[in-house]
């Protein structure tokens, strides 16, 4: 058995009105051994980092803290996600919603939520309202999800938002030697 270390990378934009309330966005850093991990999950890393960069570049000051987490060791058992949950156990009640990008680089066409709280329902409704003008529809299936790295947060009661993406070719590339940057 080969022992190795992994870690999470965390950065955030502190909220202006409710800095103690945390919105988590993220993706996982590791990949399957056959490919380079461009689709799974380099695309997700790029999407979430770009989202945070757009907020900063636009000079926006979010109401709540937006925390970007790039999880380590997802492919071998959600080790980074479990470590994040354990290390932030005392502040999980302040996590108002979480979302992960882990389905390639396809267009987001629908969002759904596992809101778990009235505040989560209200936040989901506001997010849906903001995304409607760019053609992203709200769904009503209200099932747990949002990406594997969110499972430990879901189990802890954190509301989640799932990005439904165009994944027509995702499983042709996922965990294969074809998961390369030219597919993005």
Question: Where in the sequence are the language-model features?
Answer:
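Short amphipathic alpha-helical face segments that pack within enzyme cores
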Residues: 42-50, 78-79, 83
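Short helix/strand-capping connector loops at secondary-structure junctions
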Residues: 171-182
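Alpha-helix N-cap/helix-initiation motif
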Residues: 34-44, 142, 182
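Soluble metallo-hydrolase cores and metallopeptidase-like ectodomains found primarily
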Residues: 1-38, 50-63
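Metal-dependent peptidase/peptidase-like ectodomains
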Residues: 1, 18-19, 33, 71-171
């Amino acid at each position: 058995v080969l022992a190795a270390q992994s870690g999470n990378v965390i950065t955030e934009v502190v909220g202006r009105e409710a800095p103690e309330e945390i919105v988590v966005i993220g993706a996982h850093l590791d990949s399957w051994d056959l490919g380079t991990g461009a689709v799974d999950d380099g695309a997700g890393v790029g999407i979430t980092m770009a989202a945070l960069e757009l907020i900063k570049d636009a000079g926006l000051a979010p109401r709540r803290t937006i925390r970007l987490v790039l999880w380590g060791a997802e492919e071998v058992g959600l080790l980074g996600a479990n470590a994040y949950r354990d290390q932030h156990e005392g502040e999980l009640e302040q996590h108002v919603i979480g979302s992960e990008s882990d389905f390639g680089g396809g267009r987001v066409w629908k969002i759904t939520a596992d809101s778990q709280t009235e505040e989560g329902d209200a936040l989901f409704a506001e997010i849906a309202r903001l995304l409607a003008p760019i053609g992203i529809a709200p769904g009503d299936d209200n099932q747990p999800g949002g990406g594997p790295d969110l499972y430990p947060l879901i189990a802890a009661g954190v509301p989640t938002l799932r990005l439904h993406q165009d994944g027509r070719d995702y499983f042709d590339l996922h965990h294969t030697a074809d998961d390369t940057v030219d597919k993005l």
